[in-house]
A protein has these predicted regions:
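Conserved helicase motor core of P-loop NTPases
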Residues: 1, 89-119, 124, 157-167, ...
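ASCE P-loop NTPase helicase motor core
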Residues: 2-77, 81-84, 99-228
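Catalytic phosphate/metal-binding cores of nucleic-acid and nucleotide-processing enzymes, i.e., regions
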Residues: 4, 70, 92, 135-139, ...
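C-terminal accessory regions
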Residues: 15, 320-419
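Short, conserved phosphate/pyrophosphate- and ester-handling motifs at nucleotide-, phospho-/glycolipid
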Residues: 36, 254, 379
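Short beta-alpha junctions and helix-cap segments that line functional grooves
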Residues: 43, 158, 297-299, 397-402
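Conserved acidic residues
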Residues: 144, 248, 383
Length: 419
């Protein structure tokens, strides 16, 4: 396992082709991946811009996990079959004999190792929502290396799961960003193998990178116009958050602020008083879909139609959406996340506790996407971002929070800073 770390503007992405060439690797040899669908999409766009036309990264989940729960008894059977196959290969009893015995033995040993790890998890966890996939394309496509982007978002367990495939991992990440939610960093907790520290001259001239670097060093910028569409303004100057023509992504720190902003923006858009998503409204996936692989946690989608108001007492409703590629889909959706905006209360649902629990487990989790928290924004990037600075809420992680929020902007940035 090799960790390549670097702050914004140090060239983590631009150095990747040189690493591939130095190792003599082609795109076909590499499993490119990232923690979220949006991060994987951004990684792919950067790779293809560098000439790697066939580079289409996947999420870590789709790369190494199976979408359905495997119960302990199923895993036990699979493990027994894998061990029997290994013994047949080892003793020469396999029929027909393999063309490459050494390679077949190695592949079978990998499968046994993965199944043993997954079975151990099944025995010790009450709610196993996914399992490692012993038939991952890492094995079936004979990948030589895993290249993981946005490694700061990966926790200890996922890092261990990646390592269990016994394929070299190159993890690339920014230690200035927030650690994974509810977990310790899996790759960036210690000293990286290589640390890019020098900011490229072109990047150093970018006001977004300048502000990000200041924040990372514990400094804060003054109110004013920094050029290139980058500003720091007072809350009373904020006429931008409600300017729907700007097509900016709003990032804040708390659900309370997110609910307030969403209410104001929906009212400005003409949707005030309407409880359900209306045609064209931005939405965001809040957990991975079990049906549509492309709809992973953090994916931006849009409402495809005007939906009737949410029915009080119901746990679910049918949501028509369009994904990032414009494809239409109909989703059974947990409506509690939308009802939270009405009550301004986390985990609130008008349905019975039993019905709400069942819908949260089985249905899609979607929320309004006008304003999102910084944690939800990790791994994504937008041309224009408006940051409502609530970094003070995060105490010791205040600098990491604001640094992460700032670096979500690719071209234009407005920071609404407290007085």
């Amino acid at each position: 396992m090799f960790v390549l770390a670097g702050f914004a503007g140090t060239g983590k992405s631009t150095i990747l082709p040189d690493i591939m060439n130095e190792l003599g690797l082609t795109v076909a040899d590499i499993a490119f991946c990232a923690p979220t669908g949006k991060a994987a999409k951004v990684m792919g766009e950067k790779l293809r811009a560098q000439g790697f036309t066939n580079a289409y990264p996947s999420t870590v989940h789709s790369l190494i996990y199976q979408p359905k729960m495997q119960k302990a008894e199923v895993l036990e059977k699979q493990l027994e079959e894998a061990k029997t196959q290994w013994m047949a290969l080892k003793t020469g009893a396999a029929d027909p004999p393999p063309a490459n015995l050494r390679m077949e033995l190695k592949e079978q040993e990998r499968k046994i190792h993965i199944l043993e790890k997954d079975l151990d998890r099944a025995y010790t966890m009450d709610d196993l929502r996914f399992s490692l996939n012993p038939d991952s394309k890492l094995i079936t496509d004979d990948k030589k290396i895993i290249i993981l982007d946005e490694a700061s978002m990966v926790g200890v367990e996922m890092a261990e799961d990646l390592a269990s495939f016994e394929i070299p991992v190159l993890a690339i990440g920014d230690p200035g960003q927030l650690p994974p939610v509810g977990d310790e960093p899996g790759f960036l907790s210690g000293t990286p193998d290589f640390f890019l520290t020098e900011i490229h001259r072109q990047a150093a001239e970018n006001p977004i990178i300048r502000l990000a670097t200041m924040v990372r060093k514990g400094e804060r910028g003054d109110y004013g116009d920094y050029g290139g569409g980058v500003m720091i303004i007072r809350p009373k100057q904020d006429e931008f958050s409600l300017d729907l023509a700007r097509d900016a992504q709003i990032i804040c720190g708390t659900n309370k602020r997110r609910w307030q902003l969403t209410s104001k923006i929906r009212k400005a858009a003409g949707f005030g008083g309407l409880t359900a998503p209306q045609a064209g409204e931005p939405l965001i996936m809040c957990k991975n879909s079990k049906i549509h692989p492309a709809l992973v946690n953090g994916t931006s989608i849009f409402s495809a139609s005007d939906h009737d108001d949410l029915e009080e007492g119901s746990a679910r409703f049918i949501l028509d959406i369009k994904d990032e590629e414009g494809a239409a889909k109909r989703l059974f959706t947990y409506q509690g996340l939308f009802e939270e905006h009405l009550k301004r209360e986390k985990n609130w649902s008008s349905a019975s506790k039993q019905a709400a629990f069942k819908s949260r487990i089985t249905d899609h989790s979607v929320d309004f996407g006008w304003a999102i928290t910084c944690h939800k924004s990790q791994g994504s990037q937008w041309d224009e971002v408006i940051v409502h600075d609530e970094s003070w809420v995060f105490k010791e992680a205040a600098d990491q929070w604001l640094y992460t929020a700032i670096t979500r902007a690719a071209e234009r940035l407005i920071i609404v800073a407290p007085e």
